Amino acid sequence: MSSPVAGPAAYIIPEVKLGPGNGCPNSMARVDSSCVDKYEASLVQIDETGKESPFSPYEAPNGHNVRAVSREGVVPQAHISMVEAKRACNASGKRLCRAPEWKTACKGPEATRYPYGDNRVPGACVDTNRTSPMATLHQGEHSAQTMNDPLANQQENTLAPTGSAAACTNGYGVHDMVGNVHEWTDDGSFRGGYYLDTSENGEGCEYRTTAHAPAYYDYSTGFRCCADPGSLGEDVDES
């Protein structure tokens, strides 16, 4: 049953309509004919012995042996390019989400403008009254150097742990598809906006940025992975 959540508006967390036995691992949601990560991706680094440890979400993973995981309650990876996002998804047997399946997952079973409905609700997602790290750290300067400052997303009231905005979900059970970090898709765009902007390039699930090359990254760019049902097994544990 759907559950109410206290906050600045009468949020209702949608009931997840699809569960175990749908061909997707527990960390992914079944969305039509795709499996979609429930949470924005974080990374684990793999050493020469095969041991895995968390990779810093505040640094670019360029050249590191990493793979993508979908976990609740962790800071999602930022500072990642489309090129590196693809590599991280592939290392986990997944792929970077295709633009149409990403958009379908964001809109939910009811095909709404935002994950939670057709009307914007301030504070439902991580996109309201957040702090600009460029203003805090660099007097508003936006350059390749300042926008990849590892301290950017460590400032208060910036990037939030995955799943912390309880209302930013839908009946598929995917979280944070609007706000928090931009999410790269395989057409070279990133979608959904980030914690400072979810409207400049489209509202909510329609948000789409196409201005950057696949090798581009900054403090706002993240991703999530997708897969075909049955390709990974349903007992994959990413906890």
Residue spans of the language-model regions?
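Extended beta-strand/loop cores of jelly-roll/beta-sandwich
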Residues: 1-100, 107-110, 210-239
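Functional-site microenvironments in short loops/helix caps that host divalent-cation chemistry
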Residues: 82-209, 219
